[in-house]
């Protein structure tokens, strides 16, 4: 695979981007041409009717807003908890540390289908089903373990001498963490935020099983609304998919800028 990428990088890019191109192509193809024209790289006539219908005549704007709230909140809380846990695992030795790490790893071994029923029974009496809060809690709980290990790897790469020098100059542990460690780990924080945001944005199983109300549904569940018993509205479904990709692309463009800033800031401060 590595040799193929080195010898044919252009083909790999085409292979990776073609599904996105086809998504866009179907989203602008009128319904009367979807099946009558056969397989074409570009429709003979393009239209934006599918986008207008998705925005004006469906609940997709509500699903989009719910996904944005859930994914953003989950990313912020998960990164905050993961940064604290990763820093603790990296810098401190305490009794039971490896047991805790092992238990966190074990939580990643169970398939989600196996634990969806217990989670539902746990959230139901608390009134957290059919709510965005319940999704945020579940998503945060499932993303924190991996995010913690990800953050720990970044903290491990930073020499402890930097903190010790700051503490010798009179800074306490928190001040050293905030002024020295955080700027150096901005790339790690950005990567963690991006990973958790993407995972929460595209998650379907919990969003489908824990919510039966459209008021608390996210866009992966909303895409199923374009599938009826006897037909599938491919045009509107693809248009909704394109609209759902936009915030993720914009988010990673924003994160990419901060990745570069974090690397340069770390080099200067180090």
Regions found by a protein language model. Name each.
Residues 2-270:
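A structural signal for multi-pass alpha-helical bundles of membrane permease subunits
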């Amino acid at each position: 695979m590595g040799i193929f990428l080195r010898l044919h990088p252009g083909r790999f890019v085409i292979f990776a981007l073609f599904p996105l191109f086809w998504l866009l192509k179907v989203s602008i193809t009128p319904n009367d041409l979807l099946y009558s024209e056969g397989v074409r790289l570009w429709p003979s006539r393009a239209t934006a009717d599918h986008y207008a219908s998705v925005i004006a005549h469906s609940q997709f704007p509500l699903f989009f807003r719910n996904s944005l709230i859930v994914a953003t909140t989950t990313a912020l809380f998960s990164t905050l908890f993961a940064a604290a846990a990763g820093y603790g695992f990296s810098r401190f030795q305490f009794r039971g540390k490896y047991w805790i790490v092992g238990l966190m790893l074990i939580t990643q071994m169970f398939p989600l289908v196996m634990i969806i029923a217990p989670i539902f029974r746990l959230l139901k009496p608390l009134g957290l089903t059919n709510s965005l809060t319940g999704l945020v809690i579940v998503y945060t709980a499932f993303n924190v373990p991996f995010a913690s290990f990800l953050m720990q790897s970044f903290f491990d790469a930073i020499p402890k001498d930097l903190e010790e020098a700051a503490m010798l100059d009179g800074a306490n542990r928190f001040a050293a963490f905030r002024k020295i460690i955080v700027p150096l780990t901005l790339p790690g924080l950005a990567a963690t935020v991006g990973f958790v945001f993407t995972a929460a944005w595209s998650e379907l199983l919990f969003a489908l099983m824990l919510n039966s109300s459209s008021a608390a549904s996210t866009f992966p569940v909303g895409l199923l609304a374009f599938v009826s018993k006897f037909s599938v509205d491919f045009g509107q479904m693809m248009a909704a998919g394109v609209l759902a990709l936009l915030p993720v692309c914009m988010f990673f463009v924003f994160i990419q800028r901060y990745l570069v800033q974090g690397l340069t800031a770390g080099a200067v401060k180090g």
